[in-house]
Amino acid sequence: MLFSVLLLVAILSYFWGVFSLNDQKKSIDKFVNKFQPQNQLDQKYQDMLIRLDIDSGSLNALAGIFARSGEFNKAIAIYLIALQKALTKSQKELIFLNLGKAYLKAGFIQRSIEVFLEAIKISPKNIDALSHLGLGFEKLRLHDKSLEVLDALQEQGVDVAQEIAYTKALKLKNSQMEFDQKVAKMAKFANDFKLVSRMILELFIINGKDINLINIKPDLADCLDILYLNDAILDGDEYKELYSAKGQNQTPINNFELKLLKTAKQNKINATLSFSYVCNKCKGTYPLFFYRCNHCARLGSCVIIPNLIKENDEECISF
């Protein structure tokens, strides 16, 4: 009797496993078919990769090569094929994660969110998937959802104090709240994310407010571009070198670029400053200031680089 029961349990367990695998395969096929029409990989190459005896791990590696070279459409197509060939949950989880990153890099934000959620279904504590899911919500300005993800990361012991401060400040900045109340609330997050002070300076300038009413003033290194291009003068010893370079006082200058600018003006050379912006982590260079690097997603990594140029000219002055 006992043997019969054990045999029945074993048989049921076997068929349950078969049905479960079939359900998973149908789910994967349905997911892949949803995105398949947008693939940019030639159909003959897709068919070849499907037919050949190439495992999901090898396809995942191949897709990664295309992703690293910026060919995201090809990478996405191969990840989708790899997903169909994945046999284990861990394989599927990894491919979902990499596929989501490719969609995110390619600018398909909503799709990336859907894919990261699939990875999280398999492993709810996947820190990498949660982090990138939060980035997707941030790009779509879904600040509340982004904060929910950050809370989940914090519960796992991840230090996200800076990200939480930035997200809450960003939510306030984009809100319709009354100006003084908005600024006061934003200032509370400056200790956890120091560039909140730059965000507040931007708000003052955009709204035509007196910038000397700011309680928490940003470091000059974090706002050199804004102050140089703005006519208003921000009080404080830290800023005197900048205004000396602009000819508005006689403070001695230590900063090399500012000293060059002042020397050029004293010698009647038509000179001004332009600015480029470099990520101190990945060294990516951008034409505009950023709070989060678009390439490596590092928060607060922007370094402002002043360049001396001929006024009304893009050509740098060499000395």
Model-assigned labels for residue ranges:
Residues M1-S27:
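N-terminal signal-anchor transmembrane alpha helix of single-pass membrane proteins
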Residues Y45-Q46, Y79, F116, L150:
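Hydrophobic/aromatic packing residues within the alpha-helices of TPR/SEL1-like helical repeat arrays
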Residues D53-I54, L87-S90, P124, V158, ...:
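Short coil turns that delineate tetratricopeptide repeat
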Residues S58, K92-I95, A129, Q162-I164, ...:
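TPR alpha-solenoid repeat register
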Residues I216-F319:
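Cys/His-clustered metal-coordination modules, chiefly Zn-binding fingers
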